[in-house]
Curated annotation (Swiss-Prot):
One of its GO terms (molecular function) is D-mannose binding. It comes from Danio rerio (Zebrafish). Changing K192A: Fails to homodimerize but can form higher-order oligomers. GO terms for cellular component: plasma membrane; pore complex. This is Aerolysin-like protein. It holds the Pfam family Jacalin. One of its GO terms (biological process) is defense response to bacterium. Changing D135A: Abolishes carbohydrate binding. Fails to homodimerize but can form higher-order oligomers. Its main location: membrane. The gene is aep1. Changing N246A: Fails to homodimerize but can form higher-order oligomers. The lineage of its organism: Eukaryota, Metazoa, Chordata, Craniata, Vertebrata. Keywords: Cell membrane, Lectin, Membrane. The jacalin-type lectin domain has strong affinity for high-mannose glycans with terminal non-reducing ends of Man(alpha-1,2)Man or Man(alpha-1,3)Man. A mannooligosaccharide derivative binds at G15, S132, D133, I134, D135. Homodimer in soluble form. Forms an octameric pore-like structure in the membrane.
Length: 315
């Protein structure tokens, strides 16, 4: 049986069990404080990227601190027991940003070092047992990752959304027909449009993994009653995506005899800022999958089709 996470615990069997991880929401270890005693690790306080923090053991005296930056992962981790099989004795790790941390008991010497498998290096939090001290503890890691996809994306408030569309004139031209025969005039125009889409995600996660999004993107269309919102077909996008293209239009305008026709060519631009819900599916290289529900904010810019308006007047 393969698992998406890796956890090895070092120390004794006393105390009460604790588990403080982002296993259910992808949150990672953001900051850690460690208090040490003569023959044990006294206490640990951990912060996760979802805003939670907890303290285990009983702090005493000064502490050592390590703060992780977004995208900072473990490259190595070693743990020691206290040599008597009753407590955690030391924590030592290095990161991909050149960071180093070493907290150890102060009176008893270190004996057996236990190097840990850090997997992808992305630390989901800590698990162990504690009471007045840290009896035992380990760090939970996400195993090496093959792919990360945001899927099952929904926009719960989209049906309540009243589209705000800014209409931009691309071209304005007039044709006069002073003859007694109907004339046809060709009109051509083009407009460079930049469509954008982004789905918010915690900085620690999006800085570490390349996330694909499998989703339909909100689109805007002009209808007889104004504007309506629809979804494009579900396809694969990056977490932040920009699509640049030239929208072109070629049309023929009929100008009746003794008439003037004013032609106005416009396009509508809509900005979206709305909540989304979805599922993050992390597939590890060992074939296992970690999946959890998530939510965030979608921001995007979409355009309507180019529209041609004509106004006919007598000469």
């Amino acid at each position: 049986m393969t698992y998406p996470t890796n956890l090895e615990i070092i120390g004794g069997q006393g105390g009460s069990s604790f588990s403080f991880t982002g296993e259910n929401n992808g949150a990672s270890l953001e900051k850690i404080w460690v208090w040490v005693g003569g023959w044990q690790i006294k206490a640990v306080r951990a912060w996760l990227s979802d805003g939670r923090d907890e303290t285990f053991g009983v702090p005493s005296g000064s502490h050592q601190e390590y703060v992780f930056t977004p995208g900072e992962c473990f490259t190595s981790l070693s743990l020691w027991g206290n040599g008597a099989g009753t407590r955690l004795g030391a924590i030592k790790f290095k990161t991909n940003k050149g960071g180093e941390f070493f907290a150890h008991m102060t009176s008893w010497g270190l004996k057996t070092e236990y190097p840990m498998d850090v997997g992808s290096g992305y630390c989901l939090g800590i698990v162990g047992r504690g009471g007045s001290d840290i009896d035992c503890m380990g760090f939970m890691f996400l195993n090496a990752v093959q792919s990360t996809v945001l899927t099952n994306v929904n926009y719960p408030t989209i049906n309540q959304l009243i589209p705000k569309v800014a209409t931009e004139e691309i071209k304005s031209v007039s044709f006069e027909n002073k003859t007694s025969v109907k004339q046809e005039q060709k009109v051509e125009t083009s407009k460079k449009v930049i469509k954008t889409s982004s789905w918010s995600m915690t900085k620690s996660f999006s800085s570490t993994f390349s996330v694909e999004v499998s989703a339909g993107i909100p689109e805007i269309a002009e209808v007889s009653t104004g504007f309506s919102i629809s979804f494009g077909v579900e396809s694969t996008h990056s977490l932040e995506q920009t699509d640049e293209k030239n929208e072109t239009l070629t049309t023929t305008v009929e100008v009746p005899p003794k008439k003037k026709v004013d032609v106005h060519i416009t396009i509508g631009r809509a900005s979206f800022d709305l909540p989304y819900t979805g599922t993050v599916k992390i597939t590890c290289k060992n074939g296992s999958v970690l999946q959890y529900e998530t939510k965030g904010q979608y921001k995007g810019v979409a355009y309507t089709d180019i529209k041609v308006n004509t106004v006919e007047k007598d000469l």
